[in-house]
Design a protein with these regions (language model features):
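HIT superfamily nucleotide-processing domains
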Residues: 1-155
């Protein structure tokens, strides 16, 4: 079941498209790049293919495949983007549909969860003011394609 007005559901139905398209999907989960405008190359979103807002409501099958999806996504990101660290998190406040942010932190970015979140918010604000640069859809699509190829070989 998908829900009207849910951003994640809109992406799943194709009403909104992530640059580079679907990187990986199985019966329960989809991996795509974050939506435009793109803040960081390789900033991925893993989302459940049905609308669900509570991890406790995952089916046994959905829950049992999540770990391998996260691990394989991080492995591909490690080899393609080569970040210093990969952060995986889920807030579910603005977009309640279960999804996980997979954030590659380069060595030039601050270490620490709170510092990283503040850095990303400042970077976004500077980009919105025209004082920074968004990642182009072409670069995002190229990274997505490399990640897709890597995941095809490993899963």
């Amino acid at each position: 079941m998908l829900v009207d007005g849910c951003l994640a559901c809109s992406v799943l139905t194709g009403k909104v498209q992530a640059p580079g398209g679907v990187i990986y999907e199985d019966n329960y989960w989809v991996v795509e790049h974050s939506l435009s405008p793109v803040l960081l190359p390789g900033y991925l979103i893993i989302k459940l293919k049905r609308h669900c807002e509570n991890l406790a409501e995952l089916t046994l099958e959905e829950a049992s495949t999540l770990g391998s999806i996260i691990q394989n996504t991080c492995l591909a990101l490690s080899q393609v983007v080569k970040p210093a660290k990969i952060h995986v998190c889920s807030w579910g406040e603005q977009v309640k549909h279960i999804h996980f942010h997979v954030i590659p932190r380069s060595s030039a970015m601050p270490v620490g969860n709170l510092k990283l979140l503040i850095y990303l918010q400042i970077k976004k604000l500077l980009n919105q003011l025209g004082l920074g640069k968004w990642v182009s859809d072409a670069e995002t699509a190229e990274i997505s394609q490399k990640l897709k190829q890597h995941l095809k070989m490993t899963i």
